[in-house]
Amino acid sequence: MMLQISISMSVNMDTVEENIVSELRLSPIQAKVYVLVVKKGKMSTQDIAQHLNVSEDEANQAATSLIKNGGFIDITKTEFESMHPRFAIVNMYRRMCERENIPFKKNILVDNISIILEKPYDDARTKYNR
């Protein structure tokens, strides 16, 4: 029993999108857009659409919804940037709890999502890594 719990609590870059969908109750496209911008840095809807092979409208809808969910900030009407994962993931979790009328409390899996995304976020925004 204990082994199953520890396995289900693990998050890595291969499972982060599905964990975002399950724990934050975002759509798969929202999760893909969020992780992409975390990894790449500030992006336009056109860049997001090209990277994910979706329409610009789909990219814009997903990015705009991520602003409303507390994960993104808008730089311009068509450029988006992620907030730091430690803040963004908790913001999105808190908003999901409010939407779903679930008590907001500590969630180890949500914490692990933010931890796994912290390094790619920092790497994409540090000039020494470019």
Can you describe what each PLM-predicted range is?
Residues 24, 37-40:
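Short helix-capping/hinge SLiMs at alpha-helix to coil transitions
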Residues 53-68:
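Short amphipathic alpha-helical interaction segments
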Residues 8-23:
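Short, Lys/Arg-enriched N-terminal segment that forms or immediately precedes the first helix
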Residues 46-51:
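A short acidic, leucine-rich amphipathic alpha-helix
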Residues 19-30, 44, 74-97:
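Short, cationic-aromatic polyanion-contact patches
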Residues 40, 69-70:
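Alpha-helix C-caps/helix-loop-beta hinges
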Residues 30-37:
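Short alpha-helical "packing" element that flanks the helix-turn-helix/winged-helix DNA-binding module
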Residues 92-130:
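Amphipathic alpha-helical dimerization/coiled-coil segments
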